[in-house]
Design a protein with these regions (language model features):
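N-terminal glycine-rich, Lys/His-bearing helix-loop that initiates the first secondary-structure elements
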Residues: 1-42
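Conserved N-terminal alpha-helix of the aminotransferase class I/II PLP-enzyme fold
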Residues: 30-79, 84
């Protein structure tokens, strides 16, 4: 798939319950589950939601990667990156 096509159609999903032809923006803070001990994969929006999951899947395909992680804030991203390094390590960033 061409790069520009992949940007638009990289992770096409059907939203049968809504009839949406593009990814809806899920703003729910919490999600209902079918029953006790049965999860839909989404519990709380700040942890994960269908909109962010879609974005991560598109970025993963665009970068030909294995995984992608989108953060809610820049500080969340910085904190996660800092956890990967040890005292005395050097980070070069621009």
């Amino acid at each position: 798939m061409d790069f520009s096509t992949l940007c638009i159609h990289g992770n096409i999903e059907k939203y049968d319950n809504t009839g949406a032809v593009s990814v809806p923006i899920f703003q729910s803070a919490t999600f209902a589950h079918p029953g006790v001990g049965e999860s839909t994969g989404f519990d709380y929006t700040r942890q994960q939601n269908p909109t962010r999951e879609h974005l991560e899947n598109v970025i993963k395909k665009l970068e030909d990667g294995v995984e992608a992680i989108a953060f809610a804030t820049g500080m969340a991203a910085i904190s996660a990156v800092m956890e990967l390094f040890s005292p005395g390590d050097h980070i070069i960033a621009s």
